[in-house]
């Protein structure tokens, strides 16, 4: 093998992957794990895997550390922004934690984000459960005649959304008038 051509090939590959990473960051604002998976998939698809996985992994790690050093990637900031966005959508804290874990965020950043949410809002799970009931038209948003018939179904929907039994029971026990007053406060 010719070391000079290998060096040129290595530099071309690094430049191509760095360009792909920058364009992806510009478009999507991903976490470190997401950009790593994206670059690996692009390498396998575009360059047909001409190098060993260890070499490619090193190249991708170098690119990611360089991007992180230049403040293009920041998992703490990513975790905070995603957690707030999920909370606005009506996710429970459990579902937020699970979603951030699936995005590849480490436990320390997840804990910090959840603590910030708890400090900013009093009982964020209750507020999110109210939003979920409004969005899915369950619990207090159902007609009074159907509420008892659909009680178990509504409990199941809230449980699958990540809310605890106490919060679900409290929400489903609210009257429609009380619920609407609470919605105005949100």
Question: How would you describe each model-predicted region?
Answer:
Residues 1-186:
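An alpha-helical, amphipathic repeat domain used for nucleic-acid recognition
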